[in-house]
């Protein structure tokens, strides 16, 4: 079993987006710690299976971040289950999880399931609109969410998601200072080695996604954060 606490860098691939064989090979051979498959729109059983089968040829951990029940399938090393803490819709807190457990609970290996305390911070992002997230958050709000995740819910992961834009470093830093047990994931807008380095100095693990499809060379440079210690 892989130890996710050792992961500093994850590439996130969207099954609804095209990636060439050459680019996928470069991503999977880049020394990233893991590949995560996940997205918001058009995540289907077919495109998840297709992408999974392409990535499975490489010897690195493979994660499915669950966005709907229909696309859940065996074959992944881990299943990351988001609970969107700042969503106004209970479905994105635990409603979808409840339905998944009713359907698959008898066959789940819970050692493979990681619950993520998500906070969505970009009001203009698809994920914010889809999850009906309240993104008007102060630093104090984020600190309170961090305390909730770390001390009360005791979730293994807190994911600060800026989805499409580079986040407020001071707010991410404030969250980090309240997490003593929970692992801090940061995702959103990382498009350069400098931004990757800046966020990796704060978060335990950075997630790099969109830049893969815009500039593969810049995406690959973000892996250099692994050369330095946090």
Swiss-Prot record:
InterPro entries: GGGP/HepGP_synthase_I (IPR039074), GGGP/HepGP_synthase_sf (IPR038597), GGGP_HepGP_synthase (IPR008205). Sn-glycerol 1-phosphate binds at residues 12, 159-164, 189, 209-210. One of its GO terms (molecular function) is heptaprenylglyceryl phosphate synthase activity. Pfam families: PcrB (PF01884). Mg(2+) binds at residues 14, 40. Its cofactor is Mg(2+). Pathway: Membrane lipid metabolism; glycerophospholipid metabolism. Prenyltransferase that catalyzes in vivo the transfer of the heptaprenyl moiety of heptaprenyl pyrophosphate (HepPP; 35 carbon atoms) to the C3 hydroxyl of sn-glycerol-1-phosphate (G1P), producing heptaprenylglyceryl phosphate (HepGP). This reaction is an ether-bond-formation step in the biosynthesis of archaea-type G1P-based membrane lipids found in Bacillales. This is Heptaprenylglyceryl phosphate synthase. It comes from Staphylococcus aureus (strain MRSA252).
